[in-house]
Amino acid sequence: MFDVLMYLFETYIHTEAELRVDQDKLEQDLTDAGFDREDIYNALLWLEKLADYQEGLAEPMQLASDPLSMRIYTPEECERLDASCRGFLLFLEQIQVINLETREMVIERVLALDTAEFDLEDLKWVILMVLFNIPGCENAYQQMEELLFEVNEGMLH
């Protein structure tokens, strides 16, 4: 499922391709690209739930809003988000790329993924997807994109 999300993000969203694609055509394109129907369905459902945030149909869990409070992760969250992932989320909060609300959206979307393996690079892409879909997060998206590609470009040299 995560592979489908990455493909969709890179092919349609990140490249600013036509965003209004017929769902049947999209499913057929993904099938033609070699993705499993169940993974396609799950990825589209995942994106639909993300769109609910954008449309105000869903809100992230509201936790303490005191900026000095510390987020305590549940065992399920710790299982999916290792120490490097949790540290990266904290770092992004400290440099104000994400706020308490977007952090909770990211965590909720990460937990909704049906993938056995999840690492820091995967988290960065989920954060990009969430920020892209939330109105008013354009600057945060830009900062996150710069962080993601700056680090990856540095690895190539």
UniProtKB/Swiss-Prot annotation:
PANTHER family: PROTEIN SMG (PTHR38692:SF1). It comes from Escherichia coli O6:H1 (strain CFT073 / ATCC 700928 / UPEC). Disulfide bonds: none annotated. The lineage of its organism: Bacteria, Pseudomonadati, Pseudomonadota, Gammaproteobacteria, Enterobacterales. InterPro entries: Smg (IPR007456). Transmembrane segments: none annotated. Coiled coil: none annotated. HAMAP family: Smg. This is Protein Smg. It comes from the Bacteria. Belongs to the Smg family.
